[in-house]
Amino acid sequence: MANLGCWMLVLFVATWSDLGLCKKRPKPGGWNTGGSRYPGQGSPGGNRYPPQGGGGWGQPHGGGWGQPHGGGWGQPHGGGWGQPHGGGWGQGGGTHSQWNKPSKPKTNMKHMAGAAAAGAVVGGLGGYMLGSAMSRPIIHFGSDYEDRYYRENMHRYPNQVYYRPMDQYSNQNNFVHDCVNITIKQHTVTTTTKGENFTETDVKMMERVVEQMCITQYERESQAYYQRGSSMVLFSSPPVILLISFLIFLIVG
């Protein structure tokens, strides 16, 4: 924590020094330069007092001769011929309208990031989430027959588990127990609907497989949970808050 505080202090000093140098940089202009120290004086040979509004002589608002608001001949507000307010042919909108094309829907990146970080919430399962796909573990069941049966049928068993956020459970055992039950139930119902049935041997092996996968899922969730907690503790400490606040004050000021 002390090393982290030192690095934060070094970063703060470096940023503050850079801001100080930026403020001391001379502004462009001066004698014998391309810029002008006096805004009212143009380049040599040019008009020192151009008319206000950016137009030519006799142009009150930046348009051509007889153009009151910057449009072409007979254009009162800067549009093309027959365009009252600057749009295209038959358009009454601004210059950025393009033949009434519908705007494309924008993707909400916050929602996408939240779904990727927390897993996909499964509708109709009361807040359960579906974990990412896993490789089915190598398990020995104590007999050559069961081991061979598992190798031949492991593709029929789930490779993803259903779970709830770990902060809803008091310990790992409760998390794993609930995870195993809901995963086997959902997989059995889905598979039975397709016309495939499971034997007692299948159920026994699925329980072992899903249990190992639920333990792995708990370890992943636990690691992510503590990482989020550590980040919150770091940025909520008084020294870090003070440094960040002072840095923001220097940038804004």
Curated annotation (Swiss-Prot):
Q: Which residues bind Cu(2+) 2?
A: H69, G70, G71
Keyword Lipoprotein annotated: yes
Q: Provide the residue span(s) of the region labelled Interaction with ADGRG6.
A: 23-38
Q: Which residues form the propeptide?
A: 231-253
Q: For this UniProt entry, what's an example GO CC term?
A: nuclear membrane
Which residues are sugar-modified? N181, N197
| Record keywords | Amyloid, Cell membrane, Copper, Disulfide bond, Glycoprotein, Golgi apparatus, GPI-anchor, Lipoprotein, Membrane, Metal-binding, Prion, Repeat, Signal, Zinc
> At which positions is Cu(2+) 1 bound?
H61, G62, G63
Principal subcellular localisation of the protein:
membrane
Q: Which cysteines bridge via disulfide bonds?
A: C179-C214
Question: Which subcellular locations apply to this protein?
Answer: Cell membrane; Golgi apparatus
Q: What is a GO molecular function of this protein? A: signaling receptor activity
Per the record, the similarity remark reads:
Belongs to the prion family.
Q: What is known of its domains?
A: The normal, monomeric form has a mainly alpha-helical structure. The disease-associated, protease-resistant form forms amyloid fibrils containing a cross-beta spine, formed by a steric zipper of superposed beta-strands. Disease mutations may favor intermolecular contacts via short beta strands, and may thereby trigger oligomerization.
According to the record's subunit comment, the protein's assembly and interactions are: Monomer and homodimer. Has a tendency to aggregate into amyloid fibrils containing a cross-beta spine, formed by a steric zipper of superposed beta-strands. Soluble oligomers may represent an intermediate stage on the path to fibril formation. Copper binding may promote oligomerization. Interacts with GRB2, APP, ERI3/PRNPIP and SYN1. Mislocalized cytosolically exposed PrP interacts with MGRN1; this interaction alters MGRN1 subcellular location and causes lysosomal enlargement. Interacts with APP. Interacts with KIAA1191. Interacts with ADGRG6.
Kindly provide the name given to this protein in its UniProt entry: Major prion protein
Q: Which species does the entry assign this protein to? A: Gorilla gorilla gorilla (Western lowland gorilla)
Gene name of this polypeptide: PRNP
